[in-house]
Regions:
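Intrinsically disordered, low-complexity regulatory regions enriched in serine/threonine/proline
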Residues: 2-27, 39-148
Length: 148
């Protein structure tokens, strides 16, 4: 294995999403190094701006904060929805999540599958801004990447 490339789309207007995205990236970079990748790069973009398809990333992560639920409307396939990309959909939640957080997560998955992304290529998660929790999710993404 040589390089792991990740596209990270963050709702920068949400403090929750920013913190969780940073913790997930830290976890991804550590897990990739342990998995034998010699280089790990991330292309960070604002979720609320026009998306620029980038060549290479096999994983695209969307980080939305429970505090800014309208950002879910910006979730969508990157490039060809039929391409073998793995998608991470994260709803960042505070210590006590809203009962609607699960519905928000479901909407994010539906926005991807509605554009043609296979449901099996989406890894959804409700995450707190807790490094250990985010790292477990990051490791799961890398495991899924290795098996896809």
């Amino acid at each position: 294995m040589s390089e792991a490339k990740v596209g990270i789309f963050v709702d920068y207007e949400s403090p929750l999403a920013r913190r969780v995205a940073g913790d997930v990236w830290s976890g991804l970079s550590r897990a990739a190094l342990e998995a034998g990748f010699t280089k790990t790069t991330a292309h960070w973009e604002s979720l609320r701006e026009v998306r620029t398809p980038t060549e290479g990333p096999s994983v695209h992560v969307f980080a939305i904060g429970q505090d800014r639920p309208d950002a879910i409307d910006a979730v969508g396939a990157v490039g060809d929805p039929g391409a073998p990309h793995l998608y991470g959909v994260i709803v960042a939640v505070p210590g006590k999540p809203s009962p609607l957080a699960g519905s928000l997560l479901y909407q994010g998955v539906e926005r991807l599958t509605g554009t043609g992304v296979k449901a099996g290529m989406v890894e959804p998660a409700l995450l707190h801004a807790v490094p250990a929790e985010c790292e477990r999710y990051a490791r799961r993404l890398l495991e899924r990447l290795g098996s896809s």
